[in-house]
Amino acid sequence: MSREEQPYIVATDGIVDALTKISSVFSAYLSANIHILNKYINYLRRVTSLKNERSIMIKIVKKLRFFNDTLLSTDLAQLQTTYEGEEPELALNIQTFASYLVKCLETIDLLNYFLLKPLQKELIAKTLNFDLVFPEDITDTVEDTYNHFVKFTQWSIESLSIDDPLLDIEVVQFSLRCAEEDQSYAEETDNIFLQEVLPVKDSQEYETLTLQWLDVLNGKLAILGERFEKVADDWYKKFGKNRS
Protein backbone atom coordinates (compact mmCIF):
# COMPACT_ATOMS: atom_id res chain seq x y z
CA MET A 1 0.00 0.00 0.00
CA SER A 2 1.44 3.38 -1.00
CA ARG A 3 1.53 6.35 1.37
CA GLU A 4 -1.23 7.97 -0.71
CA GLU A 5 -3.46 4.92 -0.28
CA GLN A 6 -2.87 4.63 3.48
CA PRO A 7 -5.92 5.59 5.57
CA TYR A 8 -5.65 8.84 7.50
CA ILE A 9 -4.73 7.58 10.97
CA VAL A 10 -5.69 10.13 13.61
CA ALA A 11 -3.47 10.43 16.69
CA THR A 12 -6.22 9.72 19.22
CA ASP A 13 -5.98 10.06 22.99
CA GLY A 14 -5.85 6.27 23.18
CA ILE A 15 -2.86 6.11 20.84
CA VAL A 16 -1.03 8.84 22.75
CA ASP A 17 -1.64 6.96 26.00
CA ALA A 18 -0.45 3.66 24.48
CA LEU A 19 2.72 5.23 23.04
CA THR A 20 3.41 6.96 26.35
CA LYS A 21 3.41 3.52 27.96
CA ILE A 22 5.73 2.33 25.19
CA SER A 23 8.05 5.24 25.97
CA SER A 24 8.06 4.13 29.61
CA VAL A 25 9.02 0.56 28.73
CA PHE A 26 11.84 1.88 26.51
CA SER A 27 12.95 3.92 29.51
CA ALA A 28 12.90 0.78 31.65
CA TYR A 29 14.97 -1.01 28.98
CA LEU A 30 17.57 1.75 29.07
CA SER A 31 17.54 1.70 32.88
CA ALA A 32 18.14 -2.06 32.96
CA ASN A 33 21.22 -1.63 30.78
CA ILE A 34 22.45 1.32 32.85
CA HIS A 35 22.01 -0.65 36.07
CA ILE A 36 23.97 -3.73 34.97
CA LEU A 37 26.68 -1.59 33.35
CA ASN A 38 27.22 0.39 36.53
CA LYS A 39 27.69 -2.83 38.48
CA TYR A 40 30.03 -4.23 35.82
CA ILE A 41 32.08 -1.03 35.70
CA ASN A 42 32.46 -1.14 39.46
CA TYR A 43 33.79 -4.70 39.45
CA LEU A 44 36.09 -3.99 36.49
CA ARG A 45 37.93 -1.45 38.63
CA ARG A 46 40.04 -4.36 39.88
CA VAL A 47 41.25 -5.08 36.31
CA THR A 48 43.74 -2.27 35.64
CA SER A 49 44.62 -3.62 32.20
CA LEU A 50 41.05 -2.85 31.06
CA LYS A 51 41.16 0.83 31.99
CA ASN A 52 40.39 1.98 28.43
CA GLU A 53 37.52 -0.46 28.00
CA ARG A 54 36.08 0.68 31.31
CA SER A 55 36.26 4.31 30.15
CA ILE A 56 34.27 3.38 27.05
CA MET A 57 31.60 1.77 29.20
CA ILE A 58 31.38 4.86 31.40
CA LYS A 59 30.81 6.96 28.27
CA ILE A 60 28.09 4.58 27.11
CA VAL A 61 26.35 4.81 30.49
CA LYS A 62 26.34 8.60 30.26
CA LYS A 63 24.83 8.37 26.78
CA LEU A 64 22.12 5.93 27.84
CA ARG A 65 21.30 8.04 30.87
CA PHE A 66 20.89 11.08 28.63
CA PHE A 67 18.56 9.14 26.32
CA ASN A 68 16.56 7.96 29.31
CA ASP A 69 16.23 11.42 30.83
CA THR A 70 15.03 12.76 27.49
CA LEU A 71 12.39 10.05 27.13
CA LEU A 72 11.14 10.67 30.65
CA SER A 73 10.80 14.40 30.03
CA THR A 74 9.08 14.10 26.63
CA ASP A 75 5.35 14.78 26.50
CA LEU A 76 3.83 12.72 23.69
CA ALA A 77 0.85 15.04 23.55
CA GLN A 78 2.88 16.57 20.71
CA LEU A 79 1.63 13.65 18.62
CA GLN A 80 -1.68 15.49 18.46
CA THR A 81 -0.24 18.61 16.84
CA THR A 82 -2.62 19.82 14.13
CA TYR A 83 -1.92 21.59 10.87
CA GLU A 84 -4.34 23.88 9.05
CA GLY A 85 -7.22 22.78 11.24
CA GLU A 86 -7.08 19.11 10.25
CA GLU A 87 -7.19 16.27 12.75
CA PRO A 88 -3.70 15.28 13.97
CA GLU A 89 -2.16 12.75 11.58
CA LEU A 90 -0.16 10.07 13.37
CA ALA A 91 2.10 9.24 10.41
CA LEU A 92 3.27 12.84 10.28
CA ASN A 93 3.64 13.47 13.99
CA ILE A 94 5.18 10.18 15.11
CA GLN A 95 8.38 10.47 13.09
CA THR A 96 10.37 12.52 15.60
CA PHE A 97 9.52 10.09 18.39
CA ALA A 98 10.28 7.08 16.19
CA SER A 99 13.63 8.52 15.15
CA TYR A 100 14.58 8.92 18.81
CA LEU A 101 13.73 5.29 19.50
CA VAL A 102 15.90 4.32 16.53
CA LYS A 103 18.78 6.36 17.96
CA CYS A 104 18.45 4.61 21.32
CA LEU A 105 18.37 1.18 19.69
CA GLU A 106 21.37 1.80 17.45
CA THR A 107 23.37 2.76 20.55
CA ILE A 108 22.24 -0.35 22.43
CA ASP A 109 23.24 -2.43 19.40
CA LEU A 110 26.80 -1.08 19.67
CA LEU A 111 26.75 -1.68 23.42
CA ASN A 112 25.62 -5.29 23.05
CA TYR A 113 28.32 -6.00 20.50
CA PHE A 114 31.09 -4.37 22.54
CA LEU A 115 29.98 -5.83 25.87
CA LEU A 116 29.40 -9.43 24.78
CA LYS A 117 32.14 -9.91 22.18
CA PRO A 118 35.32 -7.75 22.09
CA LEU A 119 35.27 -6.92 25.80
CA GLN A 120 34.86 -10.54 26.86
CA LYS A 121 37.76 -11.60 24.63
CA GLU A 122 39.96 -8.81 26.00
CA LEU A 123 39.06 -9.74 29.55
CA ILE A 124 40.12 -13.34 29.06
CA ALA A 125 43.23 -12.50 27.01
CA LYS A 126 44.55 -9.91 29.46
CA THR A 127 43.60 -11.50 32.78
CA LEU A 128 42.73 -15.18 32.23
CA ASN A 129 39.96 -14.40 34.72
CA PHE A 130 36.63 -15.96 33.84
CA ASP A 131 34.82 -14.66 36.92
CA LEU A 132 33.87 -11.39 35.21
CA VAL A 133 32.96 -12.95 31.87
CA PHE A 134 29.26 -12.81 31.01
CA PRO A 135 27.79 -16.33 30.85
CA GLU A 136 27.19 -17.45 27.29
CA ASP A 137 23.52 -18.15 27.86
CA ILE A 138 22.78 -14.48 28.58
CA THR A 139 23.65 -13.54 25.00
CA ASP A 140 20.47 -15.13 23.64
CA THR A 141 18.32 -13.20 26.13
CA VAL A 142 20.06 -9.89 25.35
CA GLU A 143 19.67 -10.42 21.60
CA ASP A 144 16.06 -11.61 21.84
CA THR A 145 15.07 -8.58 23.92
CA TYR A 146 16.85 -6.20 21.57
CA ASN A 147 15.30 -7.82 18.49
CA HIS A 148 11.76 -7.39 19.84
CA PHE A 149 12.31 -3.73 20.72
CA VAL A 150 13.65 -3.21 17.19
CA LYS A 151 10.72 -5.08 15.64
CA PHE A 152 8.22 -2.94 17.53
CA THR A 153 9.94 0.21 16.29
CA GLN A 154 9.94 -1.13 12.75
CA TRP A 155 6.25 -1.97 13.08
CA SER A 156 5.34 1.45 14.54
CA ILE A 157 6.78 3.09 11.43
CA GLU A 158 5.94 0.68 8.61
CA SER A 159 2.38 0.01 9.78
CA LEU A 160 1.70 3.65 8.91
CA SER A 161 3.30 3.20 5.46
CA ILE A 162 6.07 5.65 6.34
CA ASP A 163 8.92 5.18 3.88
CA ASP A 164 11.84 7.28 5.06
CA PRO A 165 15.46 6.05 4.90
CA LEU A 166 16.27 8.28 7.88
CA LEU A 167 14.08 5.97 9.98
CA ASP A 168 15.72 2.76 8.79
CA ILE A 169 17.32 0.49 11.40
CA GLU A 170 20.66 -1.00 10.38
CA VAL A 171 20.03 -4.54 11.63
CA VAL A 172 16.69 -4.68 9.78
CA GLN A 173 18.19 -3.43 6.53
CA PHE A 174 21.08 -5.87 6.86
CA SER A 175 18.65 -8.77 7.29
CA LEU A 176 16.66 -7.67 4.25
CA ARG A 177 19.78 -7.41 2.10
CA CYS A 178 20.98 -10.85 3.19
CA ALA A 179 17.56 -12.36 2.49
CA GLU A 180 17.53 -10.81 -0.97
CA GLU A 181 21.01 -12.11 -1.75
CA ASP A 182 20.16 -15.58 -0.45
CA GLN A 183 16.72 -15.50 -2.09
CA SER A 184 15.13 -16.52 1.20
CA TYR A 185 11.58 -15.68 2.20
CA ALA A 186 9.85 -14.75 5.44
CA GLU A 187 7.96 -18.03 5.66
CA GLU A 188 11.25 -19.93 5.35
CA THR A 189 13.08 -18.24 8.22
CA ASP A 190 12.64 -17.46 11.89
CA ASN A 191 14.31 -14.05 11.45
CA ILE A 192 11.87 -11.66 13.12
CA PHE A 193 13.00 -8.78 10.92
CA LEU A 194 11.80 -10.55 7.78
CA GLN A 195 8.26 -10.90 9.08
CA GLU A 196 5.98 -8.69 7.02
CA VAL A 197 4.51 -5.55 8.56
CA LEU A 198 0.96 -4.90 7.38
CA PRO A 199 -0.50 -1.36 7.29
CA VAL A 200 -3.13 -0.69 9.93
CA LYS A 201 -6.67 0.10 8.83
CA ASP A 202 -7.58 2.72 11.43
CA SER A 203 -6.62 4.39 14.70
CA GLN A 204 -8.28 1.72 16.82
CA GLU A 205 -6.22 -1.04 15.23
CA TYR A 206 -3.00 0.91 15.76
CA GLU A 207 -3.86 1.46 19.42
CA THR A 208 -4.83 -2.19 19.95
CA LEU A 209 -1.66 -3.54 18.34
CA THR A 210 0.50 -1.05 20.24
CA LEU A 211 -0.94 -2.32 23.52
CA GLN A 212 -0.28 -5.90 22.41
CA TRP A 213 3.30 -4.93 21.67
CA LEU A 214 3.49 -3.32 25.10
CA ASP A 215 2.69 -6.67 26.72
CA VAL A 216 5.33 -8.40 24.60
CA LEU A 217 8.03 -5.87 25.43
CA ASN A 218 7.21 -5.93 29.14
CA GLY A 219 7.51 -9.70 29.08
CA LYS A 220 10.86 -9.65 27.30
CA LEU A 221 12.14 -6.95 29.64
CA ALA A 222 11.10 -8.95 32.71
CA ILE A 223 13.12 -11.94 31.50
CA LEU A 224 16.13 -9.72 30.75
CA GLY A 225 15.88 -8.15 34.19
CA GLU A 226 15.90 -11.58 35.83
CA ARG A 227 18.98 -12.63 33.85
CA PHE A 228 20.81 -9.40 34.67
CA GLU A 229 19.93 -9.80 38.34
CA LYS A 230 21.26 -13.37 38.33
CA VAL A 231 24.56 -12.19 36.83
CA ALA A 232 24.83 -9.35 39.35
CA ASP A 233 24.14 -11.77 42.23
CA ASP A 234 26.88 -14.09 40.95
CA TRP A 235 29.35 -11.19 40.86
CA TYR A 236 28.40 -10.22 44.39
CA LYS A 237 28.94 -13.77 45.66
CA LYS A 238 32.37 -13.93 44.00
CA PHE A 239 33.67 -10.53 45.02
CA GLY A 240 31.49 -9.20 47.84
CA LYS A 241 30.67 -5.54 48.36
CA ASN A 242 33.58 -5.03 50.73
CA ARG A 243 36.08 -5.93 48.03
CA SER A 244 34.40 -4.14 45.07
Curated annotation (Swiss-Prot):
Protein family membership: Belongs to the SHE2 family.
One GO MF term: sequence-specific mRNA binding
Name the UniProt record assigns to this protein: SWI5-dependent HO expression protein 2
Claim: Ribonucleoprotein is one of the keywords in the record: no
Signal peptide: none
Gene Ontology process terms (BP): intracellular mRNA localization; mating type switching; mRNA transport
Pfam families: She2p (PF11435)
Keyword line: Cytoplasm, mRNA transport, Nucleus, RNA-binding, Transport
Location within or outside the cell: Cytoplasm; Nucleus
Task of the protein: RNA-binding protein that binds specific mRNAs including the ASH1 mRNA, coding for a repressor of the HO endonuclease. Part of the mRNA localization machinery that restricts accumulation of certain proteins to the bud and in the daughter cell.
InterPro entries assigned: RNA-bd_She2, She2_dom_sf
